[in-house]
Amino acid sequence: MKKILVIALAVVMMVSALALVACGPQEKVAYGIVHKSYVGKGTVVVAGGKISSASIDEACLPTYVVASEASADTVTATVLDHGAEVQKHFYKTVKFADITLEYDLTDGYKSGSTKLMDLLKEEANCEKWFEAVASDSVSVMIAGKEDKTIMTSAKLLKSKNGYWGTPAENALGWKANMEATCAYVVANGFAAESFEQVAGEGKLDNEKVDNLGVHTGATWTDMLDYYNVLKAAFNK
């Protein structure tokens, strides 16, 4: 009889512990392409079905860091940069996680026959790139050796590299937009139907959102991308 009571008590304690874990704060993370050609990481902390905090960061792609001059380890290409044709020296070979990229004059960075942007359609590959950047694990091949001092988190993470640090008139800049977006999600979750309807159009800026009575406080034109990566994290 005592043995049965001990077993029953152990089961009750285990169930209670599992219930406490389930009710406690959970950090959820999702990755995806944002702002057309960046990898975003959305993180939410959920407790009791509600969001207690949210954060966003972005990693630039390997094209963001180029060499100052041509060498045996670079490929020189003419590309469009903010509407103007410019010549850039891209690093020929870049490695991260289990993926090796080679720069192609026609398709840009590729892994085998797969273009980088097609590779990043899979969340797992977005995670590999983002976390490699964040941990300073991206290698650039220089003179046959792996160099991890070129494509660093300081150069590629928007939270560190000063991206859009000086906003234009009536804009917030990267950091303030990120904070406004996260504050909106924490306050409102993902149930605002009028916001969803506008988001479905595929383009969303603060003026359009305000016109429908949903004020996010953000001013970036790709609000939908950041909203969706946070939503994907919440739904995991």
Kindly label every feature range from the protein language model.
Residues 27, 32-236:
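Active-site- and interface-proximal helix/loop "cap" or "latch" segments in soluble metabolic
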Residues 15-29:
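Sec-dependent signal peptide cleavage junction
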Residues 1-11:
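Positively charged n-region of N-terminal signal peptides that target proteins for export
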Residues 6, 16, 218-219:
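A broadly tuned, weak detector of single residues within folded domains
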